[in-house]
A protein has these predicted regions:
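Loop-to-helix entry region of an early transmembrane alpha helix in multi-pass inner-membrane enzymes
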Residues: 5-32, 44-52, 56-60, 75, ...
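ER/secretory pathway lumenal C-terminal domains and tails of membrane proteins involved
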Residues: 34-42, 72, 77-79, 83-86, ...
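Short helix- or helix-capping micro-motifs
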Residues: 59-67, 115, 119
Length: 829
């Protein structure tokens, strides 16, 4: 549907595919609800006759509740894969339930094929595999139902083997075969044939066993059809021929990285590192096809390897999110001086990962949300303003009606039959709590992750859809007039969902992305080069240029994509919008290892900064500064008449050394090349300085400098001081940093400030420590004078004072600073 390359039709077809997939998901979910309702009503213990009207009511109610829910509705209006994922998931559940109840093998085989095909859309489709395996064991081996322990063990083993084979093992074996056939063996086959051979052997191997087997043939045929569903992956090499391609899987190496989602990494599960543990660099490698030399090349990638000891149940593991972990631990009353214990990790899993992510997403769909921002909270019944106010289009208020239906549907699922509870519990646990544990999500997610739990929403709305059965059973409703009244009463809930969610999901007049793109492109001089850094200031601009034909003369260069070979090929293609050719090509390995790496102590770099106080260049040279310097060098030498425009979303630190030479034009910062400008910013000089320092400075040490500049420098300095490298140099460096930093950068940094004070005290510099803490108290007092919440700063002052008195009981602050100051807001506190 989305295969056309004609401007507007591409976007239209992609959105249409998402909408049609959502409609198909609702259809299969409604059919699943009707089938389960008929099964429950046909049970002799319920005492209700098998009424088709009641089943249809449950199916219609379930489809409307799911369709108008916050997360599902949002997925249907976006050009993403999650709507199509939900379609495959609902269809697999429907045919799996039919097999569970009726025992018809064709439904099992169709479910296996849909699992394989759904994996090609999104890897979360693997979550339905344990449910189908459990249903198959229940049908084929009824004795395992009585031998519960043996049945659970066999179920777990099958899930581990098939789950690994489908998500990684198949492609890994294919990569090894590809290295033999297309690698250095001299056979000269194109890349990918080894992977294709392994897939064909797996497919036809199971089918041959099926033909030769005399009993239990559904096992082998199901495995064969599951592999046949994976054939949809053959579309990936075809669809990645577009000019703009990300993660093209054209060979076994890159396809293995795509298939295993290597860019997202693998978070630890049961046993792993803590975010506070020391790390040492390790070199890992991956295989990528070298089209020039016509063979596979091993690309080395420097990564972090955690030193022992490690811990159990690691939930706080990411060193990049240390500040968020520390803040959470302080809020919970824990100390941040030692690594988190397994009890702290368990509480973080329950309170943050389970409640803040998973339960909060459920609350958005069954209760409502305070606003439409990613930080939105669930509506609280204790807040009169949130719950009973009307007219706020950003607020979504379902008045607890979907939650009430969910609670009413619990008896229908658990009290009448045995198969329905088993079906629901396995599906909910795997797509909900177990997924929370496996993902091990870090704080401050880039975008909302509620789409990950979309599959769990299906089981939750299944409970709500079965609420009519509970009401009919509990209130003994049998009359037709009563049924009509009940249906009208129940369908008020999806109507409220529709009314409340319309303003949040109606994109008919939402042109914010187009308007932003036009404003930013209009801010660029003719034939200029626009430097961008993210998705939001790149893809909408490409769409505006290529689809709407607005300002095609501007060349858009994305720093995050310039290290991709396909992006270079696109920029150099004749007739392309924004054609650009880089005269200084970057190394092929730029995508897989840092350009600059420190081998020695970081003290040398800190001391040099301390002596020179030279901020003319970025503090850390990452590959992005490397790319930017090479672009500016090229333009200064070969295209001096073209202007460079920096996107407003580009982090300031990336252009710190040339910011004074830019001027604000519209919403972009324009850099015009002329003799004076070139003399001051010296792009070629900076480019050479990077090459000269290659192998000396590791950008991974400060990879989040853009987010928290001074806090991060302070934290890294304290880490080196703890290792007893050179505490005196750290003290001098941090002292210089405090003097050069703006006051607002140091406000309220209690953990870092107290750690700095302990560092001073450990070095025997008690006087400097007390002076530093006293100055912090004075800063807190000044902020408290003008703050609407002075008690927050009073607590900060008390914490500082208690820290000093803990180490120096006789120490007292000068009374002239506090008690004699009539403006002191904490007097007598």
């Amino acid at each position: 549907m989305a295969g056309s390359s004609e401007g507007n039709s591409v976007a239209y077809r992609i959105v249409l595919l998402s909408s049609i997939s959502g409609a198909a998901c609702i259809f299969f979910f409604s059919r699943l609800t009707i089938q389960i309702s008929e099964y429950i009503l046909g049970h002799p213990g319920i005492g209700l006759k098998q009424d088709s009207g009641l089943s249809l009511m449950s199916g219609g109610l379930g489809g409307l509740l799911l369709g108008f829910s916050d997360s599902f509705w949002r997925n249907c209006t976006e050009a993403e894969v999650y709507s199509l994922t939900g379609c495959f998931f609902a269809a697999t559940l429907y045919f799996g339930w039919r097999y569970f109840v009726e025992g018809n093998t064709r439904y099992f085989l169709l479910s296996c094929f849909l699992i394989g095909a759904g994996l090609c859309v999104h890897p979360t489709q693997i979550l339905v595999l344990p449910l189908i395996i459990g249903i198959h064991l229940f049908r084929q081996y009824p004795v395992l139902v009585k031998q519960i322990a043996k049945g659970i063990l066999i179920w777990l083993i099958l899930n581990l083997i098939l789950g690994y084979w489908l998500t990684e093992g198949l492609v890994f074996v294919g990569l090894q075969m590809d290295l033999i056939l297309a690698g250095h063996s001299g056979m000269g086959l194109p890349p990918g044939y080894g992977l294709l051979l392994v897939w064909l052997l797996s497919l036809f191997g199971f089918l041959i066993i099926f033909c030769l087997s005399n009993k239990k043939i559904s096992h082998w045929l199901g495995l064969g059809l599951l592999h046949a569903g994976l054939a949809f992956y053959c579309l990936i090499p075809l669809r990645t021929d577009s000019p703009m391609q990300l993660g093209a899987g054209k060979d076994a190496g890159s396809f293995y990285a795509y298939f295993t989602r290597a860019e997202f990494g693998k978070p630890p599960g049961i046993y792993g590192p803590s975010y506070m543990q020391n790390t040492r660099p390790s070199v890992q490698s991956s295989w990528h096809w070298d089209a020039i030399r016509n063979h596979y090349a091993r690309i080395k990638k420097k990564e972090k390897e955690v030193e022992d000891p490690q811990g159990w149940f690691p939930r706080m593991y990411s060193s990049a999110h240390a500040e968020a972990y520390n803040q959470w631990r302080l809020d919970q009353g824990y100390t941040i001086e030692t690594p988190p214990t397994w009890k702290e990790n368990l509480w973080f899993f329950l309170s943050e990962q389970s409640v803040h992510y998973f339960v909060r997403y459920l609350g958005w769909n069954f209760i409502g949300r305070t606003n439409d921002s990613p930080e939105s909270q669930v509506l609280s019944v204790n807040s009169f303003e949130d719950f009973f106010s009307f007219g706020n289009k950003r607020r979504v208020n379902y008045h607890f009606l979907p939650l009430l239906l969910l609670i009413l549907g619990i008896p229908s699922v658990f009290f009448f039959t045995q198969k329905v509870p088993l079906f629901w519990i396995i599906g909910f646990l795997i797509t909900g709590p177990l997924l929370v544990w496996v993902l091990n999500m870090t704080p401050d997610q880039v975008r909302e992750r509620d789409y990950v739990f979309q599959l769990c929403m299906v089981f939750c709305f299944l409970l709500a859809a079965l609420s009519p059965i509970s009401l009919c059973y509990g209130l003994n409703f049998r009359a037709k007039n009563t049924m009509r009244f009940l249906s009208a009463l129940l369908f008020i809930t999806p109507a409220i969902q529709l009314i409340e969610g319309w303003s949040s999901h109606d994109n008919s007049k939402n042109y914010s992305a187009l308007n932003f793109s036009e404003i930013l492109l209009a801010s660029c001089p003719s034939q200029s080069v626009l430097i961008t850094a993210g998705d939001n200031d790149t893809f909408p601009l490409w769409c505006t240029q290529q689809v709407y034909g607005f300002r095609p003369d501007v060349t858009i260069l994305n720093l995050n994509l310039l290290h991709q070979p396909w992006y270079y090929r696109r920029l150099e293609m004749p007739g392309q919008i924004g054609q650009f050719q880089l005269k200084h090509p970057l190394p092929d390995s730029l995508d897989y290892k840092p350009i600059l790496h420190v081998e020695g102590s970081a003290m040398e770099r800190m001391d040099s900064l301390l002596r020179s106080k030279n901020w003319s260049a970025p503090l850390v040279w990452t590959r992005y500064e490397f790319i930017l310097a090479s672009i500016l060098t090229d333009m200064e030498k070969f295209e001096p008449n073209r202007s460079v425009v920096f996107s407003p979303l580009l982090p300031t630190q990336k252009i710190l050394y040339m910011r004074a030479e830019t001027r604000l034009n519209g919403i972009g910062r324009v850099l015009n090349f002329n003799p004076d400008t070139a003399l001051r910013i010296h792009p070629a000089k900076h480019f050479k300085s990077i090459l000269a320092q290659s192998g000396r400075w590791n950008p991974e040490n400060l990879n989040h400098i853009e987010r928290s500049f001074h806090k991060l420098i302070r934290k890294k300095g304290l880490m080196h001081a703890t290792a007893h490298e050179n505490p005196d140099a750290i003290i001098r460096y941090l002292g210089w940093l405090d003097q050069s930093a703006p006051p607002d950068q140091l406000a309220g940094v209690i953990p870092q400030n107290l750690a700095y004070a302990r560092l001073l005290d450990s070095c025997g510099q008690t006087k400097q420590m007390t002076e530093f803490l006293a100055s912090l108290s004075l800063q807190a007092v000044e902020r408290a004078k003008v703050s609407a919440f002075p008690e927050d700063y009073c607590r900060e002052i008390e914490e500082i004072e208690s820290m000093i008195r803990l180490q120096h009981p006789r120490f007292k602050f000068s009374e002239s600073w506090f008690n004699q100051d009539p403006a002191y807001p904490c007097a007598g506190h």
